């Protein structure tokens, strides 16, 4: 009996350890990225999370890079795992979604290719900045996107938002939700119903722990579309002085430190359409001008002939 009493503390300790392990497993999630697989296999049972698709260890105290998020999104599509409802709208220029190649730090590699061996060069946001080519295409560097313009259009309201209040609320949002340093939000412009948010960040300005404006813009875009990447959070819920801000449309423009390298081939279709429209307009203008001149000329001839006939019919004095 005494031996059983001696074992009781050990059993209680064992049960406590099992309960603690189970609790750690339950609480082991990545609050800033739901597209991860987490476990407590780290040193001392520390919770560790790896991005789906790449298995890269992510830092859950800050935002995950856009490249790793896109790779996880494409991997989820392939495996039919329902993590985040994918949007049907293209988010990378006009090329739609693609399965990106990321470096060991989770950043986009300079050259991206698809399954058909078509390749192109991208900027630090993953947006194509050259014509598409084959696997012989060379991309020497990842050109940094240093200026992002987010353009929003909100639903009609009884009255326009106060610009100062709107500015303060959006700055608070990017600082608290997206961990973006306030100095990187350059300006907030507002002309009802259009809101423009300017993010600026040079490579020399970004510190080691600073959130990249590309990642902040991508998280914001997913929030706007109701596809939040944060665990336990729904879409964006922004209120300005108690008035909800409902966004109808979002456009994001990217400005790189170096201009893009598109050739005239990319503009061929558009140029042909423009030239055709201009040509039709010119031909129509010439036709109208000729017809108008002929009508005027015909009237003048009739008047001259009529006057000449009257002169001939007059009796001579």
From Swiss-Prot:
Keywords: Disulfide bond, Glycoprotein, Membrane, Signal, Transmembrane, Transmembrane helix. One of its GO terms (biological process) is ureteric bud morphogenesis. Residues 1-24 form the signal peptide. Disulfide bonds join 67-102, 113-119, 121-139. The keyword Transmembrane helix applies. Residues 25-270 are extracellular. InterPro entries: EPCAM-Trop-2_C (IPR049420), EPCAM/Trop-2 (IPR043406), EpCAM_N (IPR041630), Thyroglobulin_1 (IPR000716), Thyroglobulin_1_sf (IPR036857). Residues 64-139 form the Thyroglobulin type-1 domain. Glycans are attached at residues 27, 114, 162, 202. It is found in: Membrane. GO terms for cellular component: basal plasma membrane; extracellular space; lateral plasma membrane; membrane; nucleus; plasma membrane. The chain crosses the membrane at residues 271-291. Residues 292-317 are cytoplasmic. It is a single-pass type I membrane protein. Pfam families: EPCAM-Trop-2_C (PF21283), EpCAM_N (PF18635), Thyroglobulin_1 (PF00086). May function as a growth factor receptor. Belongs to the EPCAM family. This is Tumor-associated calcium signal transducer 2. The gene is Tacstd2.
């Amino acid at each position: 009996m005494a031996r059983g009493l001696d074992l009781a503390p050990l059993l209680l300790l064992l049960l406590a350890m099992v309960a603690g392990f189970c609790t750690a497993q339950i609480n082991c999630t990545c609050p800033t990225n739901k597209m991860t697989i987490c476990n407590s296999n780290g040193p001392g049972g520390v919770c560790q999370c790896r991005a789906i698709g790449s298995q890269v260890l992510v830092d859950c105290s800050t935002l995950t890079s856009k490249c790793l998020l896109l790779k996880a999104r494409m991997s989820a599509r392939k495996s039919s795992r329902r993590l985040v409802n994918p949007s049907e709208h293209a988010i990378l220029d006009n090329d739609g979604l693609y399965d990106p190649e990321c470096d060991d730090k989770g950043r986009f590699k300079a050259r991206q290719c698809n399954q058909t061996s078509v390749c192109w060069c991208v900027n630090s946001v993953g947006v194509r900045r050259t014509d598409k080519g084959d696997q012989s295409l060379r991309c020497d560097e990842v050109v940094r996107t240093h200026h992002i313009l987010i353009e929003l259009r909100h639903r009609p309201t009884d009255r326009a938002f106060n610009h100062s209040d709107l500015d303060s609320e959006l700055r608070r949002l990017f600082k608290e939700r997206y961990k973006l340093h306030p100095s990187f939000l350059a300006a907030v412009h507002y002309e009802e119903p259009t809101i423009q948010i300017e993010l600026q960040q040079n490579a020399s300005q970004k510190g080691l722990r600073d959130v990249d404006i590309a990642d902040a813009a991508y998280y914001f875009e997913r929030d706007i579309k109701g596809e939040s990447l944060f665990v336990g959070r729904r879409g964006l819920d922004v209120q300005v002085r108690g008035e909800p801000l409902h966004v109808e449309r979002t456009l994001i423009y990217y400005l790189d430190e170096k201009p893009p390298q598109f050739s005239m081939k990319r503009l061929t279709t558009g140029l042909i359409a423009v030239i055709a429209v201009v040509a039709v307009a010119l031909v129509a203008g010439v036709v109208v001008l000729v017809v108008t001149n002929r009508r005027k000329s015909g009237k003048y001839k009739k008047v001259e002939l009529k006057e000449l006939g009257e002169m001939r019919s007059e009796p001579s004095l």
